[in-house]
UniProtKB/Swiss-Prot annotation:
Name of the protein in question: Transcription antitermination protein NusB
Organism of origin: Geobacillus thermodenitrificans (strain NG80-2)
Keywords: RNA-binding, Transcription, Transcription antitermination, Transcription regulation
One annotated GO molecular function: RNA binding
Signal peptide: none
Length: 130
């Protein structure tokens, strides 16, 4: 599985976990079927959950005029995934994480999601480089 596809599946699984409050393994199974689970997909899902408090704090400090809880569910999940990658995944360049997140937002979010995600993650990127 390519990383782009793993990100899409992770987004779908994390969305189910966030909105439907289902266990991570069940959510991953829902999006992958009964096949073997890609290690990057599994890493994204479980590590975003594990680091959620730190990720959310970083997002809150970079959201202007928004509360994280008021951000659209799909956008919030995309922001969490990308922030996790930018902060914790060393083998993925920050610019790749940001670009992938914008593409996911354009595909799965509404017409404003791409620019919103880009704006927030650009601030997160700057904060992480300090």
């Amino acid at each position: 599985m390519k990383r782009h596809e793993a990100r899409e599946k992770a987004l779908q699984a994390l969305f189910q976990i966030d909105v439907g409050h289902i266990p991570p393994d069940e959510a991953i199974g829902n999006v992958t079927g009964s096949g073997e689970v890609d290690p990057f997909l599994r890493q994204l899902v479980f590590d975003v959950i594990e680091h959620r408090a730190e990720i959310d704090e970083l997002l809150r400090s970079n959201l202007e005029k928004w509360k994280l809880e008021r951000v659209a569910n799909v956008d919030r999940v995309i922001l969490r995934m990308a922030t996790y990658e930018m902060k914790y995944v060393d083998d993925v360049p920050v610019s790749v994480s940001l670009d992938e997140a914008v593409e996911l937002a354009k595909k799965f979010g509404d017409w404003k999601s791409g620019s919103f995600v880009n704006g927030v993650l650009s601030k997160v990127k700057a904060a992480l480089q300090k």
